[in-house]
Regions:
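Amphipathic HAMP/coiled-coil signal-transducing linker helices
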Residues: 8-31
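Conserved long alpha-helical elements within nucleotide-processing catalytic cores of c-di-GMP signaling
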Residues: 24-40, 47-54, 61-87, 97-101, ...
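Short catalytic/binding micro-motifs of nucleotide second-messenger systems
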Residues: 45, 88-93, 126-137, 171
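Residue-level recognition of strand-loop junctions within catalytic nucleotide-signaling folds
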Residues: 68, 107-112, 128, 150-151
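Flexible loop/N-cap segments at domain edges
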Residues: 76, 91-92, 102-109, 133
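A short pre-motif secondary-structure segment
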Residues: 95-98, 139
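A structural signal for short, well-ordered beta-strand segments
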Residues: 104, 143-147
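Catalytic cores and conserved motifs of cyclic dinucleotide signaling enzymes
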Residues: 114, 118, 150-167, 171-211, ...
Length: 221
């Protein structure tokens, strides 16, 4: 099953060299306020027209510890790597932004649960063979990925979709990281309560960001 407008990755063999990713990629990420605003709009559209909406929440494993070891410049390098990989494996209409705690939120319009899994696995697979350069040293990265999708009108609230993605990500990280976990899988493992407890502050916004932001104003790297 192919999503409309899928953009194939750039050709090339060998191990990906994330440090060579163009610097402008990290500046193309939406801020947290912007991506949440855009996701809310897409959720409303999906509910209104009965079309699917996929959500991917991604976090680089052990990033705080790696930054402590290799320096703060690694965070910018990782941001470029994530932006580059997602750009290659998604469509131009898909939306990527940063959230709290160095996480990345990817919103996939017109994408059902099965297609969301395919996109997430493609992104995860790239990271399994990726190196970034840090002070002339090659550093391997891995990512934990939580996914969910709104395939019909059963999901009533925008916040529920965020909580589902967060729950799935927590399971992926709690199981050792370096894997993709769907919210549906967490409900099978933990029963109907949806899995691990969630923090109400995970997606809390400062008061000055609660007003609708201008999505055209991208945050710099």
């Amino acid at each position: 099953m192919t999503r409309p407008g899928f953009r194939k990755g750039r050709p090339g063999g060998g191990r990906a060299q994330a440090a060579e990713t163009d610097g402008y990629l990290s500046s193309s990420l939406f801020s947290q306020a912007q991506i949440l605003h855009l996701m809310k709009n897409e959720f409303a559209r999906a509910r209104r027209h009965g079309i699917p909406l996929g959500v991917v929440l991604l976090q680089v494993d052990r990033l705080p510890q790696l930054v402590d070891i290799h320096g703060s410049s690694l965070r910018s390098t990782v941001k470029q790597a994530v932006a580059g990989v997602v750009r290659d494996k998604t469509r131009g209409s898909d939306l990527l932004g940063t959230t709290n705690d160095d996480r990345y939120l990817l919103v996939l319009p017109h994408t059902d649960a099965q297609q969301t899994r395919v996109v997430a696995e493609r992104i995860h697979q790239v990271f399994s063979s990726m190196e970034v350069r840090v002070e002339e040293r090659a550093l391997e990265l891995s990512v934990s990925v939580g996914i969910t999708a709104c395939d019909d009108r059963a999901t009533l609230f925008f916040d529920s979709l965020l909580s589902q993605a967060e729950s799935a990500l927590r399971y992926a990280m709690g199981a050792g990281g370096d894997q993709v976990v769907s919210f549906a899988e967490t409900t099978l493992l933990a029963g109907s309560d949806g899995g691990l407890p969630l923090s109400e502050d995970d997606f809390a916004l400062p008061d000055d960001e609660l007003e609708s932001p201008d999505p055209e104003e991208r945050r710099g790297g």
